[in-house]
Structures are given as C-alpha cells and as structure tokens.
Amino acid sequence: MAVLTYNNYLRQLLSKYECILAFDTAADFLGLTNGGYRSAAQIFVTKKQNIEGTEQIKIDSFEQIECQEYHGLLCTTVNQTIINLLEQDGDEQVIAESLANYYEENGQSFEALEIPEHLKIRFKKYSEWRYLK
C-alpha cells in the first residue's frame, strides 16, 4: 500500500515536468525496493526546474539514459536503475533489496541483467548472498 501511495505522490508531483525518475526513486517506483522514506525524489533533468521536493541530476540529453514510460512517468529501466545504483554506490540497503527482489522476480537469476565490466566487482559484492545456500 505504501508503494502505491508513494507512486501516486510522484505522479502528482512530476507528471507535468520533463524528467526521468532516477536512482532510489526509480527503484522504489519500479517495485525493486521494499519501500522507504525519501526526503526528495531523485530525477534526471536536462535543465534545472523549480520542483519542490526533488533532487535534480542534470544530464545533457535524455537519450543517454535507458528509460521507459511506466504508469504515466518516465523512469529508468530496471537494468538502467540497477546500473545507476551500482555506479552511485549509495544506500546499501536499496542496492541489496533491488538486487534481491530482481533475483526473485526473475526466477532466481541475474541472467538478463547487463552489468558493465567496470561494475562487476561491486555487483558481486552486493549479490554474494546468492551463493550462501
């Protein structure tokens, strides 16, 4: 229920702006995390906009980000979200939950994920639990 409420909040806040949900916000919106409190919605923008309650990450072009429309908002794809989380190396709980939930949703497999070579060591760090069976 909390995720649906948060997603509705994001739609109300961002539906009229040019932006892409990013990082922890994208992971929450896509259901990769188990939810949590976020003081600001993280979004990619091509120019800074006056949107209260957001952390805006400026990028040159939306074309450099793999995204899709999802329930009325542009959001990074699942694969792009996981890559971004690993690159950012931010909240370990968000990264671990995102990988664990992805793994379960995909038949206990990471086979479809495309992790760049430079992130494979970090990916292994956060996914070692799968070998502890």
Name these PLM-found stretches.
Residues 39, 59-133:
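Hydrophobic alpha-helical interaction segments
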